């Protein structure tokens, strides 16, 4: 045992006992270091799955609510077939209640919001009675994205995760909304495991070539796949980063893809 311990000490594996100390790491991505959120596992051998998972960093709250059992199908709110306005109304009500809970206002609710303005680096919300209100926690408002032709996105932050309220009064959903909100984007899948072993078995040379080709496309950012879905020809490719104007006038880039 002494010879073994000496060997471990000689190669630097064992060190003499020392006083208490702390270890500090650097250059660790915030997705690993401080952001708590969902993680996806996907077979990288399937390019469409790999693209979908990587792009799941941001997702539509309206779509997620409409297409799942988070919203009941009772009293005519079924989700099959074309757009169901009864279900759509429930989705929007749920989403705005979520905004009220996550980004509470000093007075009123998002359900009664009719307009958003930017005054002295703050967001001012007009309610349907004509009164003005602000966020209870003004630090939750982060920035703004101009999308042209009167459309814009409002960026908020809670627990290190971002949410974008998308305003577009020309959109079919935004047209019927008091504040012109067409959707709410939620920062969702923070990290993705691109799997080569557990969710897929890549064992021979052909399989491994597919895996590494897809992985190279992810690393270079040029992976894309085209396919036919319900008679429509679609192309899936990687999302770009999201650019916002901060309250202080500076620009910020947020990742458009999961780590």
Predicted regions and their residues:
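Active-site-facing alpha/beta catalytic cores
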Residues: 5, 13, 17-259
């Amino acid at each position: 045992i002494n010879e073994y311990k000496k060997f471990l000490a000689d190669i630097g594996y064992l060190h003499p006992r020392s006083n208490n100390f702390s270890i500090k790491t650097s250059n660790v991505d915030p997705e690993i270091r401080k952001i708590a959120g969902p993680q996806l596992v996907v077979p990288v051998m399937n390019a469409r799955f790999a693209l979908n998972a990587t792009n799941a960093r941001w997702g539509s709250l309206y779509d997620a609510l409409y297409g799942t059992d988070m919203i009941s199908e009772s009293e005519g709110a079924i989700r099959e077939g074309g757009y169901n306005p009864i279900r759509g109304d429930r989705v929007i009500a749920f989403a705005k209640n979520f905004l009220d809970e996550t980004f509470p206002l000093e007075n009123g609710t998002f359900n009664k919001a009719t307009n958003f303005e930017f005054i002295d680096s703050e967001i001012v919300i007009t309610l349907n009675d004509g009164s003005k209100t602000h966020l209870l926690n003004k630090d939750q408002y982060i920035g703004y994205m101009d999308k042209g032709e009167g459309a814009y996105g409002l960026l908020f932050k809670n627990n290190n995760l971002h949410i974008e309220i998308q305003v577009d009064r020309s959109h079919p959903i935004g047209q019927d909304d008091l504040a012109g909100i067409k959707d709410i984007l939620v920062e969702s899948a923070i990290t993705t495991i691109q799997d080569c072993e557990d969710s897929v078995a890549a064992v021979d040379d052909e399989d491994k070539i597919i895996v590494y080709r897809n992985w190279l496309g992810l690393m270079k950012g040029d992976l894309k796949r085209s396919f036919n879905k319900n008679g429509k020809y679609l192309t899936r490719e990687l999302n770009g980063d999201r650019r916002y104007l901060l309250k202080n006038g500076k620009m910020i880039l947020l990742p458009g893809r999961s780590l």
